[in-house]
Regions:
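A short alpha/beta connector and helix-capping loop motif
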Residues: 66-83, 89, 93
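Residue-level signal for inorganic ion chemistry
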Residues: 69, 123, 179
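Conserved N-terminal beta1-alpha1 strand-loop-helix module at the mouth
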Residues: 1-54, 61-64, 86, 95-122, ...
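As written
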Residues: 74, 172-173
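Alpha-helical hinge/cap motifs
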Residues: 57-58, 73
Length: 199
């Protein structure tokens, strides 16, 4: 919601297959329609066509959405600490685990590290300031040492160069969620492929 439409002509199946061929570790598929123009059908369309994990990226607020995510074919769900209480994170993540779904907890600040619990698999540090919608990878750098080593760490948003990837790896990041940097390109698949070749 921080920017206008990025790529209205994007073909979901073409792009996701291309990302897989480019050796992406997984796919993040937006299903929120109001703010991002995504849909649940985007997951069902590609589920049987690709063999890498799918993250359903949406505002997950209740158990129904978790059951829905499983039925759509998602492998991973995203819980956003800024949208939930600690208790909700714990309950929803445990519920997700009962369906054999992996859980990413997205955090933006030091305070939200306290939301971590044993049913979280991955911590995603979002580099986007939710108030100003500006991105700064220093957010990931600043929070890296505060996140317990028992969790996988990924850095989200604002990553546009391989140099930033190498820097974040030095701070212990295991993965990176990159969306806009590829999707704003006329050929997202080529942009992804070229980026990964630099790593």
């Amino acid at each position: 919601p921080s920017k206008p439409n990025i790529n209205l002509d994007a073909e979901v199946l073409t792009i996701t297959k291309g990302y897989e061929i480019s050796n992406s570790s997984g796919l993040s598929i937006l299903t929120d329609s109001k703010y991002f123009g995504g849909s649940n059908e985007d997951i069902t369309l590609v589920r049987n066509e690709i063999n890498i994990p799918i993250l359903r990226k949406d505002f997950m607020l209740d158990e129904y959405q978790i059951i829905e995510s499983k039925s759509l074919g998602a492998d991973i769900i995203l819980l956003i600490a800024a949208c939930l209480s600690k208790e909700e994170v714990k309950n929803l993540s445990r519920f997700a685990k009962s369906f054999n779904l992996q859980v990413i907890l997205e955090i933006h600040s030091e305070d939200e590290i306290a939301y971590l619990c044993d049913s979280i698999d991955v911590v995603g540090v979002n580099n986007r300031n939710l108030k100003k919608f500006e991105t700064d990878i220093n957010n990931s750098i600043n929070l890296a040492g505060m996140i317990p080593s028992s969790f996988l760490k990924i850095s989200e948003s604002g990553i546009s160069t391989s140099k930033e990837i190498f820097l974040l790896k030095e701070y212990g990041y295991d993965g990176f969620l990159i969306g806009e940097n590829f999707m704003k390109n006329n050929d997202p698949v080529s942009a992804c492929n070229d980026f990964i070749k630099e790593l």
